[in-house]
Amino acid sequence: SVPASFSSYLSNLGYNGVICYPSFNNSSIEACSQDRIEKISSAIDSLNPFEEKRDFFATSILAESTNLQFDNEGRISLSLKLLKHAKIKNSMLFVGQGQTFQIWEPTAFEKFKVTARKKANLNRANLKWEKHFNNNEGK
């Protein structure tokens, strides 16, 4: 089942499903709202139509994306292609990413998490807290 917090977030936006596509950053499945995929599509469309990188992004994200509808219990059916990409066989882990989430094979995520924590620590100065808030909370 899709995490209740995310399915409720999508329901509030008027969606009864989620867009999924294979991550090109790691062996996971990216999941997002229709609004998010439209923003990604607009960003890709803003690239020069004759540049190779535009085709790379369009193929890797848009051509591979699938609109999956929730069933009555908030579940989605992932395609074999998506499951193979994430190397998911028996169990899967839903990992929240703010307004999106990823679906991982649990052992692969645990390995990724170690690397992610190290890199986040090295890059922590890049998080500009005060730019995201109007009050003095982050100062």
What are these regions (language model features)?
Residues 1-29, 34:
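A positional/architectural concept
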Residues 66-89:
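Beta-rich strand-turn-strand
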